[in-house]
Amino acid sequence: YTTGEIRYVGEGTTDSDEDGVVDSVDDFDTDPNLASIDYIPDAGTMGTLTFEDKYPVKGDYDFNDLVMGYKYRHILDPENKVKAMHYLYTIRAMGASNALGFAIQFPTINASVGYSATLEKNSEGAIETTAQAGKTKLTFNIFANAKTELNSGSKFVNTAADGEEGEDDMVVTDLPTYELIVTFNTAVDSLAVAVPNNPYIFYTSSPNIEVHLPGQVHSSGVSTLSNYPSHSEGDEQDYLTVNGFPWAKDIQSMWDFPKEKTSLENAYPAVITWASSEGSSATTWYNDETAGYLQYRSLRKTAHQSYIRNTMRSVVFRGKYNFLGL
């Protein structure tokens, strides 16, 4: 992702706010407490978080049970510490019969840290929010039930291929967006918020059942998996099957996900090599798709992507300072 460039005084250029960072690279050249913005994945790209919800069993493995788009901005002070985080999400698709929620945890930031936070849906006005109680690390719920957020009832959303929609499928282009803004009382080390952090889904009816990216842990440190007495297929401490397949993936582009009931292995066969090599080979397996197995392979894909990009752009790029209220 893009890292804010800090250039210090002494190179013969103006430093209006006298913070030691010259105006030409100071994104906040009138504020001595702020200096630059990190864009994640980068200033012109939206990332994808995609989840399979059947953990700890593999399920149909179509990897579209919840598909989230994201764009992040970290606001740095002159010492390259993070003063604020601006996290923007949108629901791209939902192919789950289970009702699922979505949350983000910062696994190296203690819940006791001093902060203020707001959460805003669809640019309807920011509302003060607080981190989840009972967590040792800073954790925020973005929403509790994707079905409710999409007004979908029992239907799947944006996962059937064109012309294959059935009575249980919906096409939604007016997608909800969510802005989480966290401002720290004291700036934190940039490594403390290094992506991908710990985004995860949880069962609305059983929030203790969570699905995380590989290498991450349950938000409370341990999962009882109360409705799964045996979970020999996976290790709850690394969220990989015994054969090395994940239940979630962070892809730093607008990824074309498999259509409903299409296995990830069929849509992206190189993932098999990636899994068997423990991630050392086929590291860009998500770019090697198989035609006919993916969602949005028609003109609708263009319209869908255009809507998301325009929506994200209108929210994120509202000015140099406005999104922080500065």
Language model region names:
Residues 1-49:
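Extracellular calcium-associated, cysteine-rich motifs in secreted modular proteins
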Residues 40, 59-60, 95-99:
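A short beta-turn/strand-edge loop motif at beta-sheet boundaries
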Residues 43-82:
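Short N-terminal edge-element motif at the start of the domain
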Residues 64, 96-113:
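Low-complexity, serine/threonine/proline/glycine-rich extracellular segments that form mucin-like
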Residues 70, 83-93:
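Short, well-ordered beta-strand segments enriched in hydrophobic/aromatic residues
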Residues 105-130:
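Solvent-exposed beta-hairpin/edge-strand motifs
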Residues 126-145, 149, 153:
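C-terminal globular interaction/adhesion domains in large, modular proteins
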Residues 144-326:
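A eukaryote-biased signal for long
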